[in-house]
Design a protein with these regions (language model features):
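Class I S-adenosyl-L-methionine
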Residues: 3-97, 180
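Short, acidic/turn-prone active-site loops that include or flank metal/cofactor-
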Residues: 12-15, 41, 105-106, 124-133, ...
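Residue-level preference for the first positions of well-ordered beta-strands
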Residues: 68-72, 125, 144-146
């Protein structure tokens, strides 16, 4: 799709700095020659601000569609799992345009594969939990827990896991570097700085 279309929407203020772009351009070098359109998607829990950004993103894409362009929207992982793209997708559909989702590989599946680890086997359960919210109840569930989107709360999440003597993650922390350079760590204490993506 990237090769077949000339207009590529990229989440963020600066498309070339987007992790999604940096990964995609390695796989499809022709991407560097395409028209890149920035779709700002600030990470916030402010509902009004989110709504406004989703509206603006959809309008920008609709303007491109009205100009007769086919648009590919890059995103990390799979667009159906905690993806800001979904909000834009729904708006574009509601406004009468054609939009399709192409599945990708979730960050937690990519991380597990890079560690040569399985997430679940046989009758085990898998729970995907947004870690920037309350996680205590979810950690009581049986099976494997995938903690995503911890963001600024990662130090608090790590502390909580240590206090609860939690072994659900087997102390495996993955940040965005797993995606670009396949670096990983098995220490919950390893990172003192802000991290973006982990399971």
């Amino acid at each position: 799709l990237i090769r077949e279309n000339d207009t590529i929407a990229v989440p963020g203020e600066k498309p070339e700095e987007s992790i999604a772009y940096q990964i995609a351009v390695q796989a499809v070098p022709e991407l560097a020659e395409k028209e890149l359109v920035a779709i700002p998607m600030p990470m916030t829990k402010n509902a009004k601000e989110l709504e406004e950004n989703h509206r603006r993103g959809a309008e920008k894409i609709e303007e491109l569609l009205d100009a007769g362009k086919n648009v590919v929207f890059l995103t990390l992982g799979d667009p159906t799992v905690y993806s800001t793209y979904l909000y834009v997708h729904r708006r574009v559909l509601e406004d009468g345009y054609d939009a399709r989702i192409v599945s990708g590989v979730t960050s937690f599946c990519a991380a597990a594969a890079s560690l040569s680890e399985g997430l679940v086997e046989n009758s085990e359960e898998l729970h995907v939990i947004p870690a920037s919210y309350q996680i205590e109840d979810a950690l009581q569930l049986s099976g494997t827990k995938v903690l995503m989107k911890a963001g600024k709360k990662m130090p608090a999440v790590k502390q909580f896991l240590k206090e609860k003597n939690c072994r659900a993650l087997q102390q495996q922390t993955i940040n965005k570097n797993i995606i670009t350079s396949h670096r990983d760590t098995k220490e919950i204490n390893h990172h003192g700085k802000k991290e973006n993506y982990r399971w």
